[in-house]
Amino acid sequence: MLLVIGLGNPGKEYQYTRHNVGFIAIEKIVNQYNSSFSTKKKFNCEIAETISDGQKIIFIKPTTYMNLSGKSVISVKTYYNIYPAKIFVIHDDIDLETGRIKFKTGGGNGGHNGLKSIDGVIGNNYNRIRIGVGRPQNNQGVADYVLNHFSKPEYETVMQAIDRITSNFGLILENKLEEFKNKIA
């Protein structure tokens, strides 16, 4: 069983912001598996489930704000008894140029409040799919930057990155994580 978490903030005003790139990516992956999200208040998230190659996959989008994402993650992790090695978090990363993707297991949170929240409840030995959104320019604050919408060229670049994640997601199911890492880079 896998647990895949897309990080973002709830609400239409945040829908296509840089900070919601995790939501955008997970929605595309869920569509690929012909599944859809439904709200589960007891888990503080939207959840979608599917079975592929005999393996159950649980996808979640926390309905808390980013800095409380751990609340959703711990409730789903505990309910389904999922080990951190089977958890994959998709999130924005300002330390990567727009559209660049990196995959890693464990490590620090890089100041990302969603990851800080998750680390606080399950530790940091889970998998991360980091999608670059670039750094703020012209003295713009980080919070303002990540809560703003992509420009059209940025959005197109990010969607190409998300397409690489989606088209190679099956490698995660096959536990070919190194191959996944290389194909999405």
Curated annotation (Swiss-Prot):
Top-tier EC class: hydrolase
Xref: Gene3D superfamilies: Peptidyl-tRNA hydrolase
Residues annotated to bind tRNA: Y14, Y65, N67, N113
Site entry: Discriminates between blocked and unblocked aminoacyl-tRNA: N9
Gene Ontology molecular function: any one: tRNA binding
Role of this protein: Hydrolyzes ribosome-free peptidyl-tRNAs (with 1 or more amino acids incorporated), which drop off the ribosome during protein synthesis, or as a result of ribosome stalling.
GO biological process, alphabetically ordered: protein quality control for misfolded or incompletely synthesized proteins; rescue of stalled ribosome
Catalytic activity, reaction form: an N-acyl-L-alpha-aminoacyl-tRNA + H2O = an N-acyl-L-amino acid + a tRNA + H(+)
Any single Pfam family the record assigns to this protein: Pept_tRNA_hydro
Active-site residues per Swiss-Prot or TrEMBL entry: H19
Disulfide bonds: none
Spans through the membrane: none
Name of the gene this protein is made from: pth
Major site of localization recorded for this protein: cytoplasm
Family the UniProt entry places it in: Belongs to the PTH family.
Record GO cellular component, one term: cytoplasm
Localization in the cell: Cytoplasm
Protein name: Peptidyl-tRNA hydrolase
Assembly and interaction partners: Monomer.
Record-linked PANTHER family: PEPTIDYL-TRNA HYDROLASE (PTHR17224:SF1)
InterPro entries for this protein: Pept_tRNA_hydro (IPR001328), Pept_tRNA_hydro_CS (IPR018171), Pept_tRNA_hydro_sf (IPR036416)
